């Protein structure tokens, strides 16, 4: 599944290269530094039907962070293709970014596990190293008595909504 994720990134990157010129040309305009995700956090469990919050801090010395790419790997043994979600980064956050993305989770009759992969791309076409988050989405019958998802460490992340992760999770296969 990670291979599919990387192939999809390569295709998106190739399309960007053909439209905007080569990497050297874009680096002349936007700079040679790439984005770095400096801190990240997400709760390891969330109740079905709740929004899962994924916190990130990132920086780029050139100030040209442009998009957040997200993909989902379903629980082991289930090969369900999900699209890649692309969230635009606001220009005032191109140098330093802090906040959370949110992924809607389905109401469930059984728990599922997913892995979320995140990367940031800048306008020159550089990608950050990926970060991975595993989460258990538990069903409504087990939700009673469970606490809300974990909060991030205090003082590390801004409580700023960076946007939704536009992937609709489903438990249906095929």
Predicted regions and their residues:
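Extracellular acidic, Ser/Thr/Pro-rich low-complexity tracts
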Residues: 57-63
């Amino acid at each position: 599944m990670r291979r599919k994720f990387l192939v999809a990134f390569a295709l998106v990157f190739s399309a960007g290269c053909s439209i905007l010129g080569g990497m050297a040309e874009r680096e002349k305009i936007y700079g040679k530094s790439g984005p770095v995700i400096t801190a990240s956090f997400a709760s390891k469990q969330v109740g079905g039907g709740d929004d899962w919050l994924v916190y990130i801090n990132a920086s780029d010395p050139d100030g040209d962070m442009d998009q957040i790419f997200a993909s989902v790997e379903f629980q082991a043994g289930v090969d369900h293709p999900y699209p890649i979600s692309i969230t635009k980064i606001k220009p005032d956050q191109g140098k330093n970014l802090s906040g959370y993305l949110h992924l809607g989770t389905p109401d469930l009759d059984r728990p599922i596990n997913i892995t979320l992969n995140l990367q940031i791309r800048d306008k020159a076409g550089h990608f950050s190293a990926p970060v991975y988050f595993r989460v258990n989405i538990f069903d409504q019958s087990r939700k009673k008595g469970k606490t809300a998802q974990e909060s991030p460490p205090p003082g590390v992340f801004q409580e700023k909504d960076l946007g939704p992760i536009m992937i609709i999770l489903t438990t249906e296969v095929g």
